[in-house]
Design a protein with these regions (language model features):
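Short beta-edge strand/loop motif at the mouth of beta-sheet-based domains
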Residues: 7-8, 27-59
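Hydrophobic/aromatic beta-strand elements that line small-molecule binding cavities or substrate pockets
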Residues: 8-10, 57-62, 86-95
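Amphipathic alpha-helical segments
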Residues: 13-32
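A short, structured loop/turn motif at beta-sheet edges
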Residues: 16-17, 61-67, 92-102
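Hydrophobic pocket/interface hotspot
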Residues: 19, 29, 47, 60, ...
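Short, solvent-exposed secondary-structure boundary/capping segments
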Residues: 66-74
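Beta-strand/loop substructures that line and gate deep hydrophobic ligand-binding cavities in soluble
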Residues: 79-132
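Short, highly charged C-terminal tails/helix-capping segments
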Residues: 139-148
Length: 148
């Protein structure tokens, strides 16, 4: 059985600055991740992300342009995301030359939720599958923008 901490990595055919904009600008985020994004990416900022008919609050924790971004998110909407009731998502971008970026996404916090163990594992598994799909979408969105 996979653990409760999710780690996904992908090599993206785009410069780090382009990847950064795509993971931090609301109109870009909605092309590969959440359906609706109301968020300013600065430390301590509060926002909201909508996925289909579900959404949740978001609190930005770390912003180190263009290398690192982290935020806490929670659902159901209404609860303030804090340690213990939310997941921490961390994006780490590492340039691979001028035209490629290694992106690592880590999501933790499932182990701290007060859900029964089976439910906690189910959510972690769903998020693990979700991140694989979202990173595929991100890569596709950026590949479609490449000239030629």
């Amino acid at each position: 059985m996979p653990g409760l901490v999710i780690e996904r990595e992908v090599l993206i055919e785009a410069p780090a600055e382009v990847v950064w904009r795509t993971i931090t600008e609301p109109d870009q985020i909605s092309q590969w991740f959440a359906d609706r994004v109301d968020l300013v990416v600065e430390p301590g900022a509060h926002g909201y992300m909508q996925f289909g008919d579900q959404g949740g609050l978001v609190v930005v924790e770390t912003v180190e342009r263009p290398r690192r971004l982290s935020f806490r998110w929670n659902y159901p909407a209404g609860e303030e995301p804090v340690t213990g009731n939310s997941m921490l998502v961390e994006f780490t971008l590492t340039p691979e030359g001028d035209e490629r970026t290694h992106l690592r996404v880590t999501e933790s916090g499932h182990e701290l939720r007060d859900w029964p163990g089976e439910e906690r594992q189910r959510y972690a598994d769903e998020h693990r599958e979700g991140w694989a799909e979202y990173l595929d979408r991100l890569s596709s969105v950026l590949a479609d923008r490449r000239p030629g």
